[in-house]
Regions:
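A general structural detector for well-ordered alpha-helical segments in enzyme core domains, enriched
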Residues: 21, 75, 154-161, 197-201, ...
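Soluble non-cytosolic domains of exported or imported proteins
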Residues: 15-19, 145-156, 191-195, 233-240
């Protein structure tokens, strides 16, 4: 398969702000056009206080900050902005309902053609604030209509992101990746939380019919490796290994189709 356009979203491990593995994968796939919308510190879920979503809608890329605007949903919106013709209102329609981003927030740039591959690797930072604590509420959210998805949990946010992208990019092969294992005292990155996040991502991938790359177990970057190779952010040796692993997973999936 000839991959003309590759688009990725995620956190510091995928982002060019830090590790840049998303762009490394794009180059290995020989993609002619690349949009890496990932940001360091990004969370999968929108931030919230109780049931109130406190994440602002913005098209401005956060500079590797642990802030409420630095979330997957805003990365998706920046992808939509790039796909929307220059100067046009950013619109998309799901279940017969049209959604739009107000022009005062931003308009289309027309800088991206329809992607062949979309890769999303995000969840490591979920839980670093009380406002984005991870929980497996997939069962509660999986049957909700698009308009009812609050994005205040990982499942809801991923379902919203995938359904948005499936609508706007119907021909794209979408891949969700489970998180890498880490070696850190931070509770939200420990094994139990990693496994919880992995379960949510796998369930969303199955529900939406997209592909799942199990980086948690398949990449080789387990807790013992992480201890001496970057703890959270893989060192140069392991960045290469993980990029090779992800590339192989994408290629083997595409060539089977």
């Amino acid at each position: 398969m000839n991959i003309r356009c590759f688009c990725c979203m995620g956190d510091s491990i995928t982002s060019d702000q830090v590790s840049g593995i998303g762009t490394m994968v794009a180059h290995r796939l020989n993609a002619q056009e690349v949009l890496n919308a990932a940001c360091g510190y990004a969370t999968c879920s929108d931030w919230h206080e109780g049931d109130r979503n406190i994440t602002p809608v913005t098209l401005i890329e956060p500079p590797n900050t642990n802030t409420a605007d630095n979330v997957l949903s805003n990365q998706v919106r920046r992808v939509l902005q790039a796909l929307t013709p220059k100067g046009s209102i950013i619109r998309w329609t799901v279940d017969g309902i049209e959604y739009a981003i107000p022009a005062e927030i931003g308009i289309g740039t027309g800088t991206l053609t329809a992607p062949d591959v979309i890769y999303i690797a995000i969840s490591t930072n979920d839980g670093n604030q009380p406002e984005n604590a991870p929980a497996d509420d997939f069962a509660a959210g999986c049957g909700l209509p698009y308009a009812a998805l609050t994005r205040t949990s990982m499942a809801s946010s991923l379902l919203w992101a995938v359904r948005t992208l499936q609508t706007v990019c119907p021909n794209a092969a979408i891949f969700l990746a489970t998180p890498l294992q880490t070696y850190t005292p931070q509770e939200w990155m420990d094994e139990s939380h990693g496994l919880l996040k992995r379960r949510v991502i796998q369930k969303v991938a199955q529900k939406t019919g997209v592909h799942c790359i199990d980086s948690f177990y398949g990449s080789g970057f387990d807790r013992s490796v992480a201890r001496s190779h970057g703890e959270v952010h893989p060192d140069e040796e392991w960045k290469i290994r993980i990029a090779d692993f992800v590339t192989k997973e994408i290629e083997s999936t595409l060539y089977k189709e």
